[in-house]
Design a protein with these regions (language model features):
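NAD(P)-dependent Rossmann-like dehydrogenase/reductase catalytic/cofactor-binding core
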Residues: 2-7, 15, 22-190, 202
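Acidic, glycine/proline-rich low-complexity segments that act as flexible tails and inter-domain linkers
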Residues: 193-194
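Catalytic alpha/beta core domains of metabolic enzymes, predominantly
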Residues: 197-198
């Protein structure tokens, strides 16, 4: 391993932590939701916020700053002000009884918060833009919804983008962003299905 800012493990986990913090900072998901997705869909033992609390905010926030500065402020490694605020407040994770989560004297989480949204009534029909996507078609078939190959102007429109958000995908495909739902099929969908909508979606 060559000489580089941060230990190898810090660099390996940088993307997971910084992306998790960015998603939370943008209000897309809570720490408990992000951690649950990483555990259930990606096979990790714990998510980025659980890991930060375990190792200690007093360890991982300074390390993140060193890596960011060492790579000449590469924007992909930008620290989060929320991370810094926990550090400044002395909420250092399990060792202080609170970080991203609150902990009891034994180190167990106290009311971690819901890791999934409240259930809603499923749609009776959906529009699938890529009917050749066997995984997406299989999920809808298992749910019992009627699959439409063309837009009827009122049903939810399902897409399965990789590396793009819901809004960008809807615009590129000429779809109604208010009815478009992006489904993440890159991970394990047996325990959890992660979806994304555009701002202002119905």
């Amino acid at each position: 391993v060559g000489d580089t800012p941060g230990f190898l493990v810090n660099l390996g986990g940088t993307a997971i932590g910084t992306e998790g913090l960015r998603i939370m900072q943008e209000g897309r998901a809570t720490p408990s939701q992000i951690d649950a997705v990483m555990r259930d869909s990606c096979g990790f033992r714990m998510g980025p916020f659980e890991l930060m609390d375990l190792t200690g905010i007093d360890v991982n926030f300074p390390a993140r700053k060193i890596i960011y500065e060492g790579f000449f402020h590469d924007r992909r490694m930008t620290p989060s002000p929320y991370h810094e605020s926990l550090y400044a407040a002395g909420r250092l994770g399990r060792k202080t009884g609170g970080g991203w989560y609150a902990y009891d004297a034994k180190g167990a989480k106290v009311d971690p918060g819901a890791d999934h949204p409240t259930s809603t009534v499923p749609a009776s029909s959906v529009v699938i833009m890529d009917t050749h996507n066997k995984k997406l078609v299989g999920l809808i078939a298992a749910d019992g919804a009627k699959m439409l190959g063309a837009d009827d102007g009122k049903s939810p429109i399902l897409v399965a983008p990789i590396g793009k958000d819901c809004t960008t995908t809807a615009i590129e495909l000429g779809l109604d962003p208010k009815r478009t739902i992006a489904v993440d099929l890159t991970g394990d969908t047996a325990k959890r299905l992660t979806i994304m909508t555009a701002p202002g979606a119905d």
